Amino acid sequence: MFSAKARWIVAVVLRVAAAGAAAVAAVLMAMSHDEVIVYGMEVQAKFRYTPSLVFFVAANAAVSACSLVVLLVPSSTSKLAARLLLMADVVLGMVLAGAFAAAGAMAELGKNGNSHAGWIAICVQVPLFCDRVRSALVAGSATIVLYYLMLMYSIYTLPMFP
């Protein structure tokens, strides 16, 4: 249907786009911080204070780095190597989805709080922090879409039998 070179170009474009979106998501989340004075006390909000946001940064950074390192692998590798690479991509995709879900849950908690647990919403006090987290989540959702498109394309183009 498509030439080998055309398939390779599509795979590279998808991989670079996913790596770029993951890098943007990681950087945006890593830059998420805000300071305010509440009742005479200085309150800081930083991504490092929430393990799920740290996980989001680490997962996106790992996906970005691994996606770019894979580009160094020659396209003429064995079918076994291609399958191992596909399995690694699937695992990274699952980690990426888990990190996005965890960060999304924390963003929801920050925005609306939880009245049953007595947790107040913090986005009213630290809007800059919440805006940056929201921006990172938008980039993270783009990463997931691009990464799964790349996975589906890799599965489609991978030969089924040796």
From Swiss-Prot:
Membrane topology category: Multi-pass membrane protein
Membrane topology (Cytoplasmic): 1-7, 74-83, 157-162
Subcellular location: Cell membrane
Chief site of localization: membrane
Pfam entry (one): CASP_dom
NCBIfam families referenced in this protein's UniProt entry, alphabetically: A_tha_TIGR01569
Protein name as catalogued: CASP-like protein 1C1-2
Organism listed in the record: Oryza sativa subsp. indica (Rice)
